[in-house]
Design a protein with these regions (language model features):
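Regular secondary-structure segments
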Residues: 42, 114, 135-143
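Flexible, active-site-adjacent loop/turn segments at secondary-structure boundaries
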Residues: 2-8, 14, 26-30, 98, ...
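A broad detector of the eukaryotic-type serine/threonine protein kinase catalytic domain
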Residues: 98-100, 118, 122, 139-143
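Aromatic/histidine-rich interaction motifs
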Residues: 107-136
């Protein structure tokens, strides 16, 4: 199946965009976009499709997808039952690729960031302390933004 191109809404001068989705089930089909994405699953479970990988996902999962990497999170069947009461909730952070271009990213101090971006081109599932810290930071940042 050919992935759909998704255009993400960014204000002209923003390089980072925070987004929260809370629905009976995830609705975005197999798609790709030029932005780097970090997705934190708050509620829900099902099947994750990232590039050529297929695997399960569950609450608490944190993944990073690089630019142009096709992906989809598909909830299990019970989420599509109208009286299930289940919710699919996630927090996403999108980074414009231009943020990681130019002289700054070439600095020696940015070597770990360059490696992370390169690895994200095939998708990264964070585990352990990294997963916990990233999820906590995304939730805290999102909450601070809605209270501005």
């Amino acid at each position: 199946m050919k992935p759909l191109y998704q255009e993400l809404p960014f204000a002209d001068d923003n390089y980072i965009n925070f987004y929260r989705e809370d629905l009976p089930h995830f609705i975005v089909p197999w798609h790709y976009h030029p932005e780097i994405e970090i997705m934190c699953i708050e509620k829900g479970w099902g099947t994750r499709f990232v590039g050529d990988h297929i695997g399960g996902y569950e609450e608490g999962d944190v993944c990073m997808m690089g630019p142009q990497l096709p992906h989809e999170w598909r909830n299990d069947k019970e989420f599509f039952d109208s009286d299930s009461g289940l919710r699919a909730t996630c927090h996403c952070v999108y980074f414009r690729k231009e943020l990681f271009e130019g002289i700054l990213i070439r600095l020696p101090e940015m070597a770990n960031i360059r490696e992370l971006i390169e690895r994200s081109r095939r998708g990264i599932k964070f585990t352990g302390e990294s997963r916990e810290r990233i999820a906590r930071y995304i939730r805290r940042t999102f909450l601070s933004l809605i209270h501005i």
